[in-house]
C-alpha cells in the first residue's frame, strides 16, 4: 500500500549558475517572506495548543523535509536507529514490514534496497549521523575567536524578547514596549554595552549603518554579507531557527492577526534583529579574516544539500520509520477487522458524547463495558459551538474553538438567578479581589519588598506550604474561580442573553441558537433516536505547578477546558424555542429528552455534571444511574491507565491517580495524548469493543446522513487537521526534543507568562517536555505519522482533497496516511497520492 509515489517528492534545488546572479531587493524580500512562512507558530502558555512543528514545510515531502531540517537546524526527523533495531529484535517489525516499506521506493539513491540490507543497516553498531548545519556569521565568528557567539547572540535576543513580549509576569515594564519590536530593540541596543564588552566591537557601528526599517535592514544586511541568490531562503530560515522559540511566538502573533483580518510584522522585526548581529560580527572580526572566511563558508548555502553519506543514512532511517508504521498498520487493521457486536436497543437509556481526544477512547470503552444501555459518541470537544467566553469582571475572553477557526459568538459569564444589580456587585467584588491579590503579589515578589515579606510574614505561610505539599490545597488559585467566594462559584454560568461588555454585544439571537444547534447535531450524526438523557462531556485536566497545563486541556477549545462550550450547548438544546426551530428543520427532539453538561477530567477520569438544579425531577433517577455508570467507568479507566503511570495495580489506584493531580512535584500527572496514532471517522459500530489502547481519535460519522458531504468536508479540513497537528507535535518532540521539544521539565523557568526557558538562558522552548513523551526508560509516545481512516465514498474524499491545498499537501507529501473503510470497519483502499487510491 503506497502513501505516495516516490517520483512526486520535492527535492532541494542543486547548485546552479543562478547562484551567481544579481540579488535584488525584491528577491531578498520574497526570500524573507518564504523563510518566515517556514516557522510554525508557538501559542503562549495561557492556551498552549498543539502545533505541527513542520507546518511551514508541508509543500515538501516528508523525506525532503527531513534532509532540509538536518541541514538548516541539525534536526533529526526519525527516532534513534537503536529504537527500530529493538523493534526488529522484538518481532514488532517483521520482514514483511521491511519489504512493504521498501516497495514504496527509496527516499535516496544508495539507501538499503533489500530486506537483508535494511535489517543489517538497523542492527549495525554504526554511529548515528552528525549533521553540520548551514553556516551563519555567528558560527564563523566562533571558529575564528573560539568564543561561542551563536549562543551569545541567542541569549542576548532572548533576554531582550523576554522583557519586550512579557504578558504581565514582570513588574518593571519595558519602556519601549509600545514601539515595534525592531524599533524597541534598536532603542535599547543603543545603550547596551554588553556586545562591546563581549568583544563585538563593531556592534554599534553596524547599528548606525543599518536602516531603521526592519525590511530595509534585512535587504541591506543581505547585500553586505553577499548571500548568494540560491541560498537566500535557506540562510534566512537558518537564522530564524537560531531563535526558533521567539520566532515561533512572533509567528503566532501573525497567525492571530491574520485570522482576524489584520497583519503583524513582528517576525520580520526579529529576522532584522538577528541580521544586525550577523553584520555586527562580520564587521567586528574583519581584521581577523572574517571576510574571507565568510566568503568561503557562504557558498555552502547554495544548493542546501547534505553530502551523499548523510543522505543515505537519513534515507535508511526513513525506511525504518516507514516499516515501523507498517507494523502498526497491521495491528490496527486486525483490530478494526474484528469489532465486538453492538447490541442495539429500541432506545438507549442515555447517550454520552465525548471529545474525539484519544484519552476519551479509554473512557468510552470503559463506559460501554459497564453498560450496553449507553451509547457513546465522539465529536470535536468544542461541540460545534465556536464561542469566545468572557469571564466575570473581564471584557475579553479566550477563543473556545480550534485555532483554525474564529469565534462566531461572544458569550459572557454571569451569575444564575441574579439581578443585574447583584451581578454588578459580584463583578466589582471580584475585580477588587483581583487587584488586591495583584498588589500583594507585587509586595511578595518585588525586588526590595520581598525581603520585608520573608521576615515578618514568611512564617505565616508554613501551614499553606505544608497543605500544598500534601496536595490538600493548590499552590495558586485556579484562574477560573479566582476572586469568587464558594457560594458565587456554584452559581456562575454562561449567559445567552444580550449584554454590552467592553463595547461589544454578547449572547446569541434565537435564530443563531437554532442555526448552531442544527449544525452541531448534524455534525455529530445525532439527528434522531435521542435517549432520555444526552450527556455532552467536554474535557479538561487537573494539575498543579505545571506551566504547560493548558496543553492537557482541549485543543478543540483553543487550549481551554470544554466546560463553557457544553454548558452553552445544553442551554440551547434544552430551550423549547430552539427545539421548535429544530423541528421545523427536520430534527425532532422528544419532549422527555434532557441534555446534560459534564466535564471529563482526563487526569483523574472523574466526570463532573454541571447545573444539576436545571435537570427536571422526572429525570432524577436517570441522572443517578448515569452518574453511577460514569463513576464505574472512571474506575475501569484509571485501572487501565495505571500501568503506564507505574501505579501498583494491587494498591489504591483511585487514590494514587488523584494524588498525582495534586502533587506539585509530579512531572507526569498524566500522559496527555502520548501514543496518538490514528484518527477514525465512522459510526461507532465499526470500532465498538476494539481495544485501541487510547491511541485513536474517534469521530462519529455516518456518510449516509451527510447529504452533499458537507460534514465530511468539515471533518477533513478541521478535526483531521487538528489531530495531525497534535500527532506531529508529539512526533517532533519525541524524535528531536532539542529542536522541537522543550527539554527537561524540572529545569523550566517561565518567562513573561508566555513560555519557558530551559534553565535561565537560551531560546524560548517549543513543543513538549521530554517527560511528556518518555518515562525515563522508554518512549511512551512511539513516533509515527497519523493514520486517518474514514468510512465514506472514495469519490467524495477525493473531491475534498482536490479542493483544499493543505489537505492535499499533507496527504500527497506523506505527512499522514489516509485509508477508506467499508461498512464492516475493514480497510479497503489507501490513498496513494495524486488523487489516486490503491486497493488493499
Swiss-Prot record:
Chief site of localization: membrane
Domain of life where this protein originates: Bacteria
Molecular function via GO: zinc ion binding
Keyword flag DNA damage: no
Membrane topology per record: Peripheral membrane protein
Keywords tagged on the record: Cell membrane, Membrane, Metal-binding, Transport, Zinc
Residues that hold Zn(2+) according to the record: 355, 357, 539, 554
Residues in coiled coil: none
One of the record's GO cellular component terms: plasma membrane
Cofactor: Zn(2+)
Compartments where found: Cell membrane
Stated family: Belongs to the inorganic carbon transporter (TC 9.A.2) DabA family.
Functional note: Part of an energy-coupled inorganic carbon pump.
Subunit-level organization: Forms a complex with DabB.
Protein name: Probable inorganic carbon transporter subunit DabA
Biological source species: Roseiflexus castenholzii (strain DSM 13941 / HLO8)
Taxonomic path: Bacteria, Bacillati, Chloroflexota, Chloroflexia, Chloroflexales
Amino acid at each position: 500500500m503506497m502513501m505516495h509515489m516516490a517520483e512526486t517528492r520535492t527535492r532541494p534545488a542543486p547548485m546552479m549558475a543562478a547562484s551567481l546572479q544579481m540579488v535584488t531587493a525584491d528577491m531578498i524580500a520574497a526570500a524573507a517572506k518564504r523563510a518566515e512562512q517556514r516557522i510554525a507558530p508557538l501559542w503562549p502558555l495561557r492556551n498552549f495548543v498543539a502545533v505541527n512543528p513542520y507546518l511551514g514545510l508541508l509543500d515538501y515531502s516528508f523525506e525532503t523535509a527531513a534532509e532540509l531540517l538536518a541541514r538548516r537546524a541539525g534536526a533529526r526527523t526519525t527516532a534513534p536507529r537503536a529504537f527500530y533495531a529493538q523493534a526488529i529484535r522484538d518481532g514488532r517489525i517483521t520482514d514483511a514490514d521491511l519489504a512493504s516499506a521498501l516497495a514504496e521506493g527509496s527516499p535516496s539513491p544508495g539507501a538499503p534496497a533489500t530486506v537483508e540490507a535494511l535489517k543489517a543497516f538497523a542492527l549495525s553498531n554504526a554511529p548515528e549521523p552528525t549533521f553540520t548545519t548551514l553556516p551563519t556569521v555567528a558560527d564563523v565568528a566562533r571558529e575564528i575567536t573560539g568564543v561561542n557567539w551563536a549562543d551569545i547572540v541567542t541569549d542576548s535576543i532572548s533576554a531582550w524578547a523576554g522583557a519586550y513580549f512579557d504578558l504581565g509576569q514582570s513588574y518593571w515594564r519595558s519602556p519601549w514596549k509600545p514601539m515595534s519590536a525592531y524599533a524597541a530593540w534598536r532603542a535599547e541596543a543603543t545603550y547596551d554595552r554588553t556586545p562591546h564588552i563581549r568583544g563585538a566591537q563593531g556592534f554599534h557601528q553596524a547599528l548606525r549603518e543599518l536602516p531603521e526599517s526592519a525590511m530595509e535592514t534585512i535587504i541591506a544586511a543581505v547585500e553586505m554579507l553577499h548571500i548568494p541568490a540560491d541560498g537566500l531562503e535557506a540562510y534566512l530560515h537558518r537564522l530564524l531557527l537560531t531563535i526558533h522559540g521567539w520566532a515561533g511566538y512572533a509567528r503566532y502573533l501573525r497567525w492571530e492577526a491574520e485570522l482576524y483580518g489584520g497583519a503583524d510584522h513582528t517576525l520580520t522585526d526579529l529576522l532584522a534583529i538577528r541580521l544586525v548581529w550577523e553584520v555586527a560580527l562580520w564587521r567586528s572580526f574583519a581584521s581577523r579574516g572574517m571576510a574571507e572566511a565568510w566568503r568561503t563558508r557562504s557558498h555552502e548555502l547554495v544548493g542546501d544539500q547534505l553530502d551523499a553519506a548523510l543522505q543515505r543514512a537519513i534515507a535508511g532511517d526513513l525506511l525504518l520509520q516507514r516499516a515501523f508504521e507498517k507494523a502498526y498498520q497491521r495491528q490496527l487493521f486486525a483490530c478494526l477487522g474484528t469489532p465486538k457486536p453492538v447490541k442495539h436497543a429500541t432506545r438507549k437509556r442515555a447517550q454520552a458524547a465525548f471529545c474525539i481526544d484519544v484519552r476519551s477512547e479509554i473512557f468510552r470503552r470503559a463506559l460501554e463495558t459497564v453498560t450496553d444501555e449507553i451509547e457513546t459518541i465522539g465529536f470535536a470537544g468544542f461541540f460545534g459551538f465556536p464561542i469566545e467566553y468572557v469571564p466575570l469582571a473581564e471584557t475579553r475572553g479566550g477563543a473556545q474553538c480550534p485555532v483554525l477557526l474564529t469565534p462566531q459568538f461572544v458569550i459572557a459569564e454571569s451569575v444564575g438567578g441574579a439581578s443585574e444589580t447583584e451581578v454588578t456587585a459580584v463583578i466589582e467584588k471580584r475585580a477588587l479581589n483581583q487587584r488586591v491579590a495583584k498588589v500583594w503579589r507585587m509586595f511578595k515578589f518585588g525586588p526590595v519588598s520581598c525581603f520585608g515579606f520573608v521576615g515578618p510574614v514568611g512564617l505565616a505561610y508554613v501551614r499553606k506550604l505544608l497543605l500544598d505539599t500534601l496536595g490538600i490545597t493548590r499552590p495558586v488559585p485556579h484562574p477560573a474561580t479566582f476572586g469568587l467566594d464558594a457560594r458565587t462559584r456554584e452559581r456562575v454560568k454562561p449567559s445567552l442573553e444580550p449584554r454590552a461588555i467592553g463595547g461589544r454585544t454578547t449572547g446569541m439571537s434565537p435564530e443563531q441558537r437554532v442555526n448552531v444547534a442544527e449544525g452541531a447535531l448534524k455534525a455529530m450524526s445525532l439527528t434522531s433516536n435521542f435517549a432520555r438523557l444526552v450527556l455532552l462531556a467536554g474535557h479538561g485536566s487537573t494539575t498543579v505547578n505545571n506551566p504547560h497545563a493548558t496543553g492537557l486541556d482541549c485543543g478543540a477549545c483553543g487550549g481551554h477546558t470544554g466546560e463553557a462550550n457544553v454548558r452553552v450547548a445544553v442551554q440551547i438544546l434544552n430551550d423549547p424555542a430552539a427545539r421548535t426551530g429544530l423541528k421545523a428543520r427536520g430534527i425532532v427532539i422528544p419532549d422527555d429528552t434532557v441534555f446534560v453538561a459534564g466535564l471529563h477530567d482526563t487526569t483523574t477520569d472523574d466526570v463532573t455534571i454541571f447545573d444539576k438544579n436545571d435537570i427536571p425531577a422526572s429525570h432524577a433517577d436517570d441522572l443517578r444511574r448515569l452518574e453511577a455508570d460514569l463513576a464505574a467507568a472512571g474506575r475501569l479507566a484509571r485501572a487501565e491507565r495505571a500501568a503506564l503511570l507505574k501505579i501498583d495495580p494491587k494498591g489504591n489506584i483511585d487514590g494514587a491517580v488523584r494524588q498525582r493531580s495534586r502533587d506539585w512535584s509530579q512531572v507526569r500527572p498524566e500522559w496527555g495524548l502520548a501514543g496518538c496514532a490514528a484518527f477514525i471517522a465512522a459510526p461507532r459500530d465499526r470500532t465498538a469493543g476494539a481495544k485501541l489502547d487510547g491511541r485513536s481519535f474517534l469521530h462519529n460519522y455516518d456518510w449516509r446522513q451527510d447529504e452533499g458531504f458537507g460534514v465530511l468536508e468539515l471533518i477533513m479540513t478541521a478535526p483531521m487537521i487538528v489531530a495531525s497537528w497534535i500527532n506531529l507535535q508529539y512526533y517532533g518532540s519525541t524524535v528531536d526534543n532539542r529542536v522541537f521539544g522543550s527539554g527537561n521539565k524540572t529545569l523550566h523557568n517561565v518567562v513573561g507568562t508566555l513560555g519557558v526557558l530551559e534553565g535561565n538562558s537560551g531560546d524560548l522552548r517549543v513543543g513538549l517536555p521530554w517527560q511528556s513523551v518518555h518515562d525515563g526508560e522508554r518512549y511512551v509516545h512511539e513516533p509515527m505519522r497519523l493514520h486517518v481512516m474514514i468510512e465514506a465514498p472514495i469519490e467524495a474524499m477525493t473531491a475534498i482533497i482536490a479542493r483544499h491545498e493543505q489537505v492535499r499537501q499533507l496527504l500527497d507529501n506523506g505527512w499522514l496516511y489516509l485509508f477508506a473503510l467499508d461498512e464492516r470497519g475493514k480497510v479497503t483502499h489507501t490513498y496513494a497520492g495524486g488523487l489516486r487510491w490503491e486497493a488493499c
